[in-house]
Amino acid sequence: IRSCDPLARFLQFYLNMIRGNVFLLNSTNTTEIFEQMIRIDEKDALIGISFPRYSMRTLKAMEFANDRQAKIITITDTIYSPMCLYSSCNLLARSNMVSIVDSLVAPLSLINALVVALCLKRPDDVKKNLESLGQAWDNYQVYLKDEFNYIDESLLSTPLQKEKEQKL
């Protein structure tokens, strides 16, 4: 939510690639968050990300998940953060507001480390998922391949080279 949205999207993208069944709570109002979380229970985990000025919507989502016995993980700046009220695991990273823009460098580094650690815990699953993704990307041409040659190489010849070739 708010300035933490890019961090949450990055984390959700990679967690979904590793495990699947990962959802991003994204909303402009609190009621929509509860609608998205209505099925959360003790088998689920919620990762709340918030830095000063702490988001009340994130805090309320964490409270709701906690009331339903879901596991709560927090990514925040200090143990004194209100985000730590409901979490059993606090991952701390500084987020200094040097100017009008929050610095997300440390939190993003923490998220990178978390993703790598989770990959190391389930290497076979990750390898299988990445191989399946790679196959899908190849089959449906998601990314350009080097073997495609969109440039007609004859057009790269200089006018002088063309003249020489015509004289021969």
Feature roles, as predicted:
Residues 122-160, 167:
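Internal, active-site/partner-interface "lid" segment
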Residues 1-109, 113-122:
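Glycine-rich phosphate-binding loops that contact phosphosugars or nucleotide phosphates
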